Amino acid sequence: MHFARDTTRGGTAAHQWHVSRGSGIEGEMNDSSDVSLGFLSAMTTPEMSATIFETIFAADRGRPSETRIAMYDGEGQPGRNDECWCGSGKKYKKCHWQTDERLQELYDKGYEVPTRDILKGPADIEAIKASAAINVGVLDMVAERIAPGVSTEEIDQWIYDYTIEHGGTPADLGYGGFPKSVCTSINDVICHGIPCKEDVLKEGDIVNIDCSTILDGYYSDSSRMFCIGEVSSERRRLVEETKKAVEAGLAAIKPWGLLGDVGAAVHEYAKAQGYSVVREYGGHGCGFEFHEDPFVSFVSEPGEGMVLVPGMTFTIEPMVNAGAPDIDSSDPNGWTVRTADGSDTAQWEVQVLITETGYELLSW
């Protein structure tokens, strides 16, 4: 489900990703199934990561190492030989001490930095991956079954049953009063389409399936686009290019880089294809909570936004319109958002972990 800034509802995207360990894009499009282009995790070497930090932020290696009463996030600093705050069991000096020193300096220089309560430790990351495995499995299952003649109500039941059978809970169900286990957004619906028996998928439709899972208190979130039967070349191109826009955002991820560079890369790619990007909704942190910091804008400027720090987890999920970027949120159900001009729209969502060398896909 997407996250909205300056709107009354939150939310997230939906679609399908197949991870490849090779270079480039893999996958085939099925006439009545999902569009599976796939992509690699873009990585940087530790040396490159260090260079990025030194060049952009000019870290001072001689900073005093005494503990501080309050650091960049208002919390105290552990002693160097104390157990690290992340739960790793390691001594602070062997774990997050250097990260905290960097973040403190960046904060002092005026950069927006993540607070420690959104950075995930090793045990947290493994728990989020377990949740994500269910979320990916749900969407893989939908890819096998979705076809013309299927109602979105049926899809909702599939997703509820699969999630419960695998020990999870659908995060959408009851969230802010949302009545279903998944968001199903067809053609001109940007986000938060509510499944119902009346919405029956037809040949030529494009639909976004946005699925989120809770397992042992940890959250995962991703979505996929599906082409139903034979679709027009215009719709197929919109779906394909929107996914490539997400890939452009992933390629812009650099540890100790800036979040605005990611959103700007997405926006630049989409505009170059003749499309517009929705302004009001974006990605979000996800892991400890369904929606947590940071907000991920896809109309951001390069060189702005939060510093990307290893341990951050968030979604990349632009909503790309074939027409104008304006939205219509007047639906009486209080949730469903459409394009204001009735044009088609597409969205893909992935959940990523920032690592020391690049990123890792968690859910797709």
PLM features per residue range, with description:
Residues F3, M48, G79-R80, S88-K94, ...:
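Active-site neighborhoods and metal-handling regions in enzymes and metal-associated proteins
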Residues H2-T12, Q16-I25, M29-I118:
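Acidic/negatively charged segments and metal-coordination signatures
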